[in-house]
Amino acid sequence: MAFIDVKNKKGTADKEPPAGYDSWLDFWEKKKGKKATQCEVMRCNGSPDIGGHVIKVGEGSKEYILPMCSACNNKPDDEVFKAWDTDLVPVQ
């Protein structure tokens, strides 16, 4: 496991989760097979309010879902933060 650099992805606020999922957080929980217990941004212990859309820095535009608190989800799109690589779930 390793920490990686990620950023919030622009333009995803109105994006609906795939059929069969109540929310993006529900999508993450079902794909990971566990309940989200905290914001997964490094050094944040906030509650996981949403499944935030992030991209890996340097990887292009491939989207991932990460449990995040509202404050971390509202970071500017150009602000880089760290998360565990294993906590990211790809959006297909």
Language model features with spans:
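Short cysteine-rich clusters marking metal-coordination/redox-active sites
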Residues: 36-42, 69-72
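Short beta-strand-alpha-helix junction that forms the catalytic/metal-binding core
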Residues: 59-76
